[in-house]
From Swiss-Prot:
Lineage: Bacteria, Pseudomonadati, Bacteroidota, Bacteroidia, Bacteroidales
Keywords from the named record: Ribonucleoprotein, Ribosomal protein, RNA-binding, rRNA-binding
Cellular component, GO, one term: ribonucleoprotein complex
Name this polypeptide is given: Large ribosomal subunit protein bL9
GO terms, molecular function: rRNA binding; structural constituent of ribosome
Signal peptide: none
Name of the gene this protein is made from: rplI
Length: 147
């Protein structure tokens, strides 16, 4: 079954993408939750016309994301956490703490755009992935230190 995504769906696609999904996933989850519509011929024509009209807007959004990515390349983050005597963190470091540190540096990023591949439970250096645009993905190094 082909559907047109109405919003970004993790591990599936981005808004206005035409993707193939299993029938049950499309009918029981994506379409009822208003995350997608069935990709009929008329829906595809409407999508093509909308995309033609949005080309300039999308180029500006991509340019802004690239500018932000260039700005973020020079930023290094240090996150303080309470630790035990042998360097293990009480709790863990999540995308919320990274978004807060970026906000302190003057860069507002939604925490949904930040992903960390591993669970951070110890002091050390790590990398977080920021998905600023569907074509622009950068890694930001950060260090976890004891408070």
């Amino acid at each position: 079954m082909q559907v047109i995504l109405l919003e970004n769906v993790d591990k599936l696609g981005y808004k206005d993408d035409i993707v193939t999904v299993k029938n049950g996933y499309g009918r029981n989850f994506l379409i009822p939750k208003k995350k997608a519509i069935f990709a009929s011929k008329t829906a595809k024509k409407v999508l093509a016309e909308n995309l033609r009209q949005q080309v300039r807007k999308l180029e500006k959004i991509k340019k802004d994301a690239q500018t932000l990515a260039n700005k973020l390349m020079n930023i290094s983050l240090t996150i303080g956490a309470k630790t035990s005597s042998n360097g293990i963190i009480f709790g863990s470091i999540t995308n919320i703490q990274i978004a807060d540190e970026l906000a302190k540096k003057g860069v507002q990023i939604e925490r949904k755009l930040i992903s960390i591949k591993e669970h951070i439970k110890e002091i050390g250096s790590y990398k977080a992935t920021l998905r600023l645009h569907k074509d622009i993905v950068i890694d930001i190094p950060f260090e976890v230190i004891a408070e």
